[in-house]
Amino acid sequence: MNSTWKQYITILKNVVKPALGCTEPICAAYATSVATQMLGEKAETIDVFVSDNLYKNSMGVFVPRTGRVGLAIAAAAGATGGNPEAGLEVLAKLTQSQVNEAQQLIDAGRVQVKRETTDEFIYCRVVVKGSQHHAEVTISGGHTLIVEKRLDDNVIFSLDSSLPKASTASICDGVDITISSIYDFATHAEFDDIKFILKAKDLNIALAQEGLKNPYGLEVGRTYQKNIDTGLLSKSLDSDILIYTSAASDARMGGANLPAMSNYGSGNQGIAATIPVVKMADFYNADEETLARAFIMSHLGAIYIKSHYPPLSAFCGNAVTSAAAAMAMVYLAGGSFEQSCSAIQNTISDTSGMICDGAKSTCAMKVGSSAQSAMKSSLLALNNHCVTKQGVIAEDVEKTIKNIGRMITTGMPNIDHEIIEIMAS
């Protein structure tokens, strides 16, 4: 295997991984779990300082195993029952007594959450005080990327600032990667080297099944399934994609105790990169090797596109994640590389106006809409229809990706600010 392909596998293994609960509040839970471990005693007070974007994406989402919403319960639960060794699955073994203990801290006014001015989009600093000591943990640039630890005001760990951060924001820096090279890797790599990606199907389909079995959030997936059962809607590949993607997001945003296989720090985006591809593969009776190759396109393609703009912004990441899913869906249908590129162009054209106004139950609608766009865009591409040189869509897919990155990075910060101020008011 050449060195570039090894880099691709490293990227995938670093960025496509299980996460229990929405990753923004889980970031705070992870930080407090580490700080409490440093203390060696029970937490008595917890102060949480977060970036505007982390604040935005934590306000309306349920925290797994708690039945509650927001940063305060996430941070408190991380301190009372989090396992710092579990990373993004820090709350996987949280007990009800630990949840009760966390709620008692909140009710006593011992957990405070504040926004902090910072240039980082993913940023969380926690100060946890016990009876004898106090510990401070700072995460910056990635949901579990600790850059500093302090115990009783003494720095006991500091990340070397000269080293490149292992965060999603920079993970493609210095890597020779394009849509063409991703396609080449996906179609020619040895199956044994890429079959690890199949775990995405197991986790995200299980999450979808949970969302169909039990009521979570807006019950988008269950509602569509109910209307198919009554005959108002017809069952089809398109409806299956909508139902399963929405149901998985329903469950995730509703605090289901099951992990998602995330993409770029987002469980919903992991769902968007996985489930439409699974459903297309099922339709064509694709074998595991073909599915794995399609997953490489959807997951690595999504990572590559999203590396052109900040990891948290005013733009809904499911939009371009679904563009990469559309690329994979064309491949599964027997389309050409050129048609896969057309699918990306079509999806970005369709979804480029979708904003992010925080992680919450309505994400299930956006995930479903993005997945349906991937289906629509792949069908257009397979019939040789492609959006070109219209709006932000260029003649070439690489230029389109650069355009969308520019639009988000330089054009949307003010929109993001206003969204956050509206939500906080």
UniProtKB/Swiss-Prot annotation:
GO terms for biological process: L-cysteine catabolic process to pyruvate. One of its GO terms (molecular function) is L-cysteine desulfhydrase activity. It comes from the Bacteria. InterPro entries: Ser_deHydtase-like_asu (IPR005130), UPF0597 (IPR021144). Transmembrane segments: none annotated. Belongs to the UPF0597 family. This is UPF0597 protein VSAL_I0741.
